[in-house]
């Protein structure tokens, strides 16, 4: 039995699609934890065991982890949380206890790059995510943290300015190169680990994409794919903070985002060497052709 948390989210929904296709050939049953089962297609609900509720709730994870062999763990965003610890480790503590109570053998979690880099000491959400990984590993469960860089898919939030003004923004230096990954590759990495549980102990699995890119590189590729000029504009951390605050996001979360983006510009994502094992397949150009361009043209 594989339990999937956040099955309607960007990564979890892709993972669920993969497992629905592949799990039967591995003799695996699937269970999902979801707040609103109505967000799952009826055809999906018919093929999985559904536990309704929040996976931060002790009673919910107690039901969901009964008889479970493996768990996919992803914490949801909480833009009004009083602290980053409450978003990550605080949300995970009930599940960590349930892993031990129910003898869950393997857990795969969504985390971040940065462990071992100087920038990770004050990197907001990344620092909190790494602490969550340590909490899960301390239970003795076999654990793999998917160590991810910035998602290509984050650009979908900027479809309107890309389409209407030919511009996208970020806070990083324009020519600083770093890995970027597609969420579909993160889901595929999770599926591989959940279906082949021959691994043990605790560790990280970096998902780095096939190449490092700068914001200027991304602007060039966007221009070529969309057939129209697209440029990058660097946003100051002060303006970034003001924009997040204007959206009504809580102070603790805003502080974390600002610290994380500062750390990324200080090399947070550059501490892992790309190898055939860590290089995920989707190029930024392919992602733009297959995902971003249709969204821009819609």
Where are these regions (language model features)?
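Conserved Rossmann-fold cofactor-binding substructure of NAD(P)-dependent oxidoreductases
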Residues: 45-69
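A hydrophobic C-terminal alpha-helical subdomain
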Residues: 200, 237-298
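General small-molecule cofactor/ligand-binding pocket signal
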Residues: 49-51, 144, 231-235
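Oxidoreductase cofactor-interface core, primarily capturing Rossmann-like NAD(P)-dependent enzymes
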Residues: 1-40, 56-59, 66, 77-86, ...
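Aromatic "clamp/platform" in nucleotide-sugar-dependent glycosyltransferases that forms part
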Residues: 87-92
């Amino acid at each position: 039995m594989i339990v999937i948390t956040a099955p309607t989210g960007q990564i979890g929904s892709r993972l669920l699609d993969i497992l629905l296709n592949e799990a039967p050939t591995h003799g695996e049953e699937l269970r999902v934890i979801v707040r609103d089962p109505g967000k799952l297609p009826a055809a999906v609900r018919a093929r999985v065991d559904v536990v309704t509720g929040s996976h931060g709730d002790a009673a919910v994870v107690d039901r969901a982890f009964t008889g479970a062999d493996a768990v996919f763990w992803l914490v949801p965003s909480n833009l009004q949380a009083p602290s980053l610890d409450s978003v990550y480790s605080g949300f995970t503590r009930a599940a960590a206890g349930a892993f031990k109570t129910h003898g869950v053998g393997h857990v795969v979690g969504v985390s971040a790059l940065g462990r071992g880099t100087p920038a990770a000491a004050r990197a907001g959400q990344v620092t909190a995510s790494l602490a969550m990984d340590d909490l899960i590993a301390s239970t003795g469960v076999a654990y793999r943290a998917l160590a991810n860089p910035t998602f290509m898919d984050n650009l979908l939030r900027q479809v309107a300015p890309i389409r209407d003004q030919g511009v996208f923004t970020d806070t990083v230096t324009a020519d600083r190169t770093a890995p970027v990954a597609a969420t579909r590759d993160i889901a595929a990495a999770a599926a591989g680990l959940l279906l082949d549980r021959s691994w043990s102990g605790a560790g990280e699995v970096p998902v780095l994409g096939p190449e490092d890119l700068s914001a200027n590189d991304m602007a060039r590729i966007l221009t070529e794919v969309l057939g129209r000029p697209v440029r990058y504009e660097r946003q100051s951390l002060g303006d970034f903070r003001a924009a997040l605050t204007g959206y009504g996001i809580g102070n603790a979360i805003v502080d974390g985002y600002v610290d994380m983006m500062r750390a990324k510009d200080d090399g947070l994502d550059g501490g892992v060497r790309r190898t055939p094992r860590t290089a995920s397949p989707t190029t930024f150009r392919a992602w733009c052709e297959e995902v971003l361009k249709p969204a821009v043209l819609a």
